[in-house]
């Protein structure tokens, strides 16, 4: 898109929004302050560098075999840098523990150290990014069906030690980069068939978490993540929503809400306001579940729009940490990053551009026809012209222009892998 066209369209959109009492410049400034936490695992289908030929376990699945998958740390970084160059704004990167710079050495998960992630810290600083971190319970000989909730004390100790070390790594990331790192704990623990020991397993998980959080990490924002089920673990998940919600609230931690980790008829957006009333902050994993936790690429759909609305309209942008979590191996992986990131940003922008003051005035007066009418009209306002201007401000391609950049990178880089 030509710059003069973008500017002209923005000026018209600005005037149109002003008629509804909305300041587009203020919305753009607010959008600029939202840092998405990009997930490193879209580059390589959650393979990591610990065991590149290993099998993905833990009830999760990356489907597809599109060529060009990143095979090592340099390719992962190059792909993230390319995606970053096509996404407006300043963003973070979320790493799993299996993405350490192990330099070809076998380092088991209860032996990981900050030194294995120092090159990531240096890379992030050089690329004007901050880092977040995740312990990794899956795809390991000791994963099985149970990790932190395993009745075998030795196995449980192994995973406690891994998680303690993961938090220390996150603490070092936060310290060196001057921004607290979100550390998220998600474990796959569960059962394929019926269990008669739910209370016991959950007691073990609570005990393990208590041991993990004995260690103080001042540069970390701690989060715990629930899930309804995983493939092969359909009948019981130890870390249910109720378990982690209770644990998070009682221990002053963040609860992580992943859009794919609930029943298809549950809406994550409806949980936001309740969680914010009892927790200082929450962590979100923006995803797109199709019938189950399929981790499809995020698109600009109703679920994402309503999620953004709840956050923006609650005035909670400074209390919600927004991460992406999906991995589609069936399409260009760099393109997947750009589509999902832009869709999420567009949802937040649309929420910011909605005349919420007028809508609440209608609602307070019982004028429900007017409320619904204005909500509907807001959808067709020229918000896309505002987003294109945001792209121009940040020096990235506007509109569909990024498609050519992704195709060029594929021709010159990923297709040769």
Positions of predicted regions on the chain:
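Alpha/beta catalytic barrel-like cores
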Residues: 1-151, 158, 168-169, 175, ...
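Short, hinge-like loop/turn segments at secondary-structure boundaries
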Residues: 150-152, 273-274
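Extended substrate/RNA-proximal surfaces in nucleic-acid metabolism proteins
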Residues: 164-167, 173, 179, 202-209
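Aromatic- and glycine-enriched pocket-lining scaffold segments that form the walls
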Residues: 180-190, 194
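Short linear capping/connector segments at secondary-structure termini
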Residues: 188-190, 227, 326
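Acidic/histidine-rich catalytic cores of soluble enzymes
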Residues: 192-303
